[in-house]
Amino acid sequence: MKNLFFTLVLLFTTLTQAQDRLTGRNFASRSEIISQHGMVASSQPLATQVGIDILKKGGTAVDAAIAVNAALGLMEPTGSGVGGDLFAMVWDVKTQKLYGLNASGRSPKALTLDYFTKNNYTKIPSSGPLPVSVPGCVDGWFELHSKFGKLPMQDILQPSIKYAEEGFPTTELIAYYLQMSISKYMKQFPNVKETYTVDGKLPQKGDIIRNQFLANTYKKIAKGGRDAFYKGDIARETAKFIQEQGGFLAYEDFATHRSDWIQPVSTNYRGYDVWELPPNGQGIATLQMLNIIEAYDFSKIPFGSAQHLHIVNEVKKLVFEDRAKYYADSDHMKIQVSELLSKDYAAKRRALIDPNRAGEFQAGKESNSGTVYLTVADKDGNMVSLIQSNYRGMGSGMVPPQLGFMLQDRGECFNLAEGTANSYA
């Protein structure tokens, strides 16, 4: 069973186009970027350049997206990496079709609700071996590559292998997040210090970071394909380590893992079709918010005003309530996605908003997740929207020896109460 996947969604910023600071509003800080031969956007400049270089070599949007994701797993391990999951949408020019990929992993087959009940757990821990599910990222790479890739995987992963071996400078933000996570986990779990510190010390802004362990893992993946990760030594060593730490993830869980090609879902917002992946992702929360907020005329509501903030907050609270109550593995949802995305349902939810006071909705808890987002377009017009995550923060704290990555803690999302949409089973 796959658990509920949370992503960080930033909504309801100004609806104006990007403008130069001199010609636009005072708070405008970025110009529109226009390119003739493709474009890459990510949270890390070096990773973005890796993607651009792949496009220059004739790679597709998918080739570049995989290369960027691999670089981010090295350069921003606080939110991503091959120990996590992957979700993607691909626009294919040739078929004029939008494809969706759910590359999230399932919980260990041997870990049952009965175990948590007998050991008096009221919730799944956020760290350690128990929240670890099968990491789906690498399988996601190869699923995407088999359909839409062009360059050899060795070429795609080589830039990240080089950076892992030769080093790269740590940015201020990532140094901050690394310090928070490493200082906590290195006191609790093995292999964290050896993998993520610089000469045994917490990384500081500007420090040159290397990760030979991850370079070796990338080399194995580049040479041996997805089976090198799921049916080889990486899977065996990871499963052995997790079980030594008291967990249940087994080699068989890796060997039987598969990603799923799925149909994206959409809503129409003021004439624009907006697409997302269905649960177990939380992308439809964005679509629900758009449906509810569509009826408000923001040309008459000043941006940042009390009224504007009130509407946005109430809409988010309503949708987060649905997210907590209904979103789950699509095979186990008790309400159809089409119902949640209907305009009639949005109108009923909108009617609950009092324009003068905050509603007492039992909103779902907003997660503090570690996630990276990237998007790529190539010269032919193919486009990729990809999100990849270790879930909360840097992940579970579980770092298999000499592999260079931390495993996700997405299993924390399961509900241990019986009968809910996202109950552990």
Predicted segments with their positions:
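Short glycine-rich loop/turn motifs
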Residues: 36-38, 85-87, 262-264, 286, ...
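Noncatalytic scaffold domains of N-terminal-nucleophile
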Residues: 19-49, 61-224, 229-231, 236-281, ...
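Glycine-rich phosphate/pyrophosphate-binding beta-alpha loops
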Residues: 275-283, 371-375, 387-398
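Bacterial Sec-dependent N-terminal signal peptides
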Residues: 1-20
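Active-site rim segments in enzyme catalytic domains, especially the processed small/beta chain
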Residues: 74-78, 84-99, 248-250, 382-425
